[in-house]
């Protein structure tokens, strides 16, 4: 089931976010100080708990427990992460379908080198617009996808 995130989901959302970013972005950024030093579960969970308004655009996929989440901003997809233990089970697709059907989600930014994510979004009609910019504080580009 897909439902709005609550403060009770903060630690699970933080865990999924941090571990998925480590797995998928380490080979792109090559910065272990960030991946294993700066990116920590507890501070992110605490940030959600102390600032519950940060959960407002987050929807979780729950099947006994939270297995993934999508963070929406108007018609944009800000983040979508599925716990790596539950990848390839259709969870990400259900979250994208939910965003499209309920919020008319039609755009997002993704790391240019994140081919896996670009292919995934392509299956839902998202295509590269040709717009790109540097990701804040890095030397890596993000590209805009629209449907």
Q: Predicted segments — roles?
A:
Residues 1-15, 25:
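A short beta-loop-alpha structural element at the N-terminal edge
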Residues 55-68:
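Conserved beta-hairpin
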Residues 77-87, 110-111:
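A short, internal acetyl-CoA/4′-phosphopantetheine-binding micro-motif in the GNAT/acyltransferase core
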Residues 82, 88-101, 119-123:
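Conserved acetyl-CoA-binding loop-helix of GNAT-fold acetyltransferases
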Residues 21-47:
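Conserved GNAT-fold acetyl-CoA-binding loop/helix
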Residues 122-131:
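Conserved acetyl-CoA-binding loop of GNAT-fold acetyltransferases
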Residues 108-119, 134-139:
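Conserved beta-strand-loop-alpha-helix junction that forms the acyl-donor binding cleft
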Residues 96, 101-113:
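Conserved GNAT acetyl-CoA-binding A-motif
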């Amino acid at each position: 089931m897909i439902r709005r995130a609550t403060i009770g989901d903060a630690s699970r959302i933080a865990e999924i976010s941090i571990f998925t970013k480590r797995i998928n972005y380490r080979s792109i950024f090559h910065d272990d100080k960030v991946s294993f030093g700066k990116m920590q579960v507890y501070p992110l969970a605490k940030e959600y708990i102390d600032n519950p308004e940060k959960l407002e655009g987050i929807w979780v996929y729950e099947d006994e427990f939270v297995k993934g989440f999508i963070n929406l901003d108007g018609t944009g997809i800000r983040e979508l992460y599925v716990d790596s233990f539950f990848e390839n089970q259709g969870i990400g697709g259900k979250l994208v379908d939910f965003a499209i059907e309920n919020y008319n989600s039609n755009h997002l930014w993704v790391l240019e080198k994140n081919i896996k994510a670009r292919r995934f979004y392509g299956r839902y009609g998202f295509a590269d617009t040709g717009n790109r910019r540097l990701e804040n504080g890095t030397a890596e580009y993000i590209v805009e996808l629209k449907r």
